[in-house]
Swiss-Prot record:
Protein name, as recorded: Uncharacterized protein ML2432
SUPFAM superfamilies, per database record: Xylose isomerase-like
Family, per entry: To M.tuberculosis Rv0498 and S.coelicolor SCO3347.
Signal peptide location: 1-21
Keywords: Signal
InterPro entries membership: IolE/XylAMocC-like, Xyl_isomerase-like_sf, Xyl_isomerase-like_TIM-brl
Length: 280
């Protein structure tokens, strides 16, 4: 019998609250663990402090998201090469299975040139998997407003249209020929990618899912799954019916909520969606 797929909560899902709130919500609502987003918050950078939160709330850390966002370029130093290695060491210390990382930015030339080799070397020396995440380009239609942007994507049948990628070699991680991948369903919406086709292309290399949604806006939305246009249920069912042995992490935006009750409702709805469609 295939094991139950574990469902985690990203600490980014409670922003602007701190990481501790994610552990608290995960424990209260019944998530199987958390994904640690390493960014500006000091606790997220302090692995001993994170260990303490994990013990206090009895919630394990399933994965670590490396500090590779634009807003976290100076976290753990400015050089992305040692930052990726440090992320793997953090995952080892926390007992996490996976490190999530974005493809390099184009201006990070030395990092980009050695990225595939570094990922392979780090994986060869550790039990931690480094799952490179699909991203999205900077779309020209972001200047036309939300409704026009969605309509333009609908008319062209998907795809980003005129756009510029800031990632090397591509916002599509499969261009890097890595062993392991993260699929983010908000990013597929923004990129106009076919999520189900990407699942098939990633194949057994798909070891981590960021479960969320998007409506096709040029901005990254991270909606509650089922509230956008992505085939979120179908993707979950496809993984549940396959030999997927990774984790599914809810990475949804709750930053616009007006109350703690509204945030809890969104996180509860997200977990219920995952449990329903990942059932084996």
């Amino acid at each position: 019998m295939r094991p139950v797929i574990k469902v985690g909560l990203s600490t980014a899902s409670v922003y602007p609250l701190r990481a501790e709130a994610a552990f608290e919500y995960a424990a209260k609502l019944g998530y199987d663990g958390v994904e640690l987003m390493v960014w500006g918050e000091s606790v997220s950078q302090d692995i001993d402090a994170v260990k303490g939160l994990s013990r206090r709330y009895r919630v394990p850390v399933l994965s670590v998201h490396a500090p590779c966002l634009l807003i976290s370029q100076r976290v753990w130093g400015a050089n992305p090469v040692p930052k990726l290695e440090r992320s793997v060491r953090a995952a080892e210390q926390l007992g996490a299975q996976t490190v999530v990382v974005h493809p390099p930015f184009r201006w990070q030339r030395r990092y980009a040139e050695g990225f595939s080799d570094q990922v392979a070397e780090l994986e060869a020396a550790s039990d931690v998997m480094i799952a490179v995440e699909n991203m999205f380009p900077f779309r020209a239609d972001r200047f036309f407003g939300a409704d026009q942007s969605r309509e333009r994507m609908r008319k062209r049948g998907g795809g980003p249209g005129p756009a510029i990628s800031v990632f090397a070699p591509s916002f599509d991680p499969l261009a890097g020929n890595h062993a392991h991948y993260t699929l983010d369903l908000s990013h597929t919406a923004t990129a106009g990618s076919d999520s189900l086709e990407m699942v098939r292309r990633m194949g057994s290399g798909l070891v981590h899912l960021h479960l969320c949604d998007g409506s096709g806006l040029p901005a990254d939305e991270h909606l509650v799954p089922g509230r956008g246009t992505q085939p979120t249920a179908a993707v979950c069912q496809l993984l549940a019916g396959a030999d997927f042995a990774g984790h599914v992490v809810l990475e949804v935006s709750t930053s616009s909520v007006r109350s703690a009750t509204e945030r809890e409702t969104m996180l509860t709805e997200s977990l219920q969606f995952a449990r329903t469609y990942l059932l084996r």
